């Protein structure tokens, strides 16, 4: 054992009683319903894959996460589609003045910069939006019609191998989030999925957490569409229970609605009671609103009341909260 450590370095061989904390450190996504299903947030020092169809809410989730990650250090956003919207970022709580924004053309240069940032140990989180926007230099400098089969996947695989090997060695806690698009799986037949993600199997394999993000319905006030509902499925989760489902809402112009999630949890815990369509505080009887949307909005718009119920839920014993793992 001593020879192995001398030859390959400290940490090359360990035992189970080395004092490693089994409660893996995480950073909240800023979305209560999602945090609940992934063990509290995205795991530090790991790769996360957010994938789904366009307009489902992937970038919004990534920005909400960055707002939380900024509390722990420097954050970077690689805008590979030239679609970064500072207003949307601020809406999700991001301090845009402190956010490092990168526009790098070639995939090779972009991946090298991501590796450099991650290995400094000074960056809390990196978001790459999107993986589909990573364009190999050969494609940029070549002609339309040139074939570059598998090149993007090979470059990604090489970079992610380097990251997954070197990040633990340098004690880097950087969380790298790839936003990925779905594309048609040409040639799929039988029970094979009709859709796949860009870049081959590299991100699928190296990501510790993979979340399928989809839009499942509209939110309306009368005839006006005011938002939509999002469903996140944890297709892969190495550090928590996989195959969990989180449902939550995003309100246009306001951001993610944690009020609805908090309302459901508080009702399940008996902190809020429902009588007909009315919601009220279980202790004081103070009304929160008529209907779920109104009550959820009341919680979202009053930070003091929201925080009071959130802290009350945290103080409850585990068996007093609804922790079902069933699919909706």
Which positions does each model-derived feature cover?
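Flexible beta-alpha connector loops of hexameric P-loop NTPases
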Residues: 51, 97-108, 139-156, 189-195, ...
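Phosphate-binding/switch region of NTP-binding enzymes
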Residues: 117, 149-269
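The Walker A/P-loop phosphate-binding site
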Residues: 2-102, 111-120, 289-292
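Catalytic P-loop NTPase motifs of RecA-like helicase/translocase cores
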Residues: 84, 134-135, 185
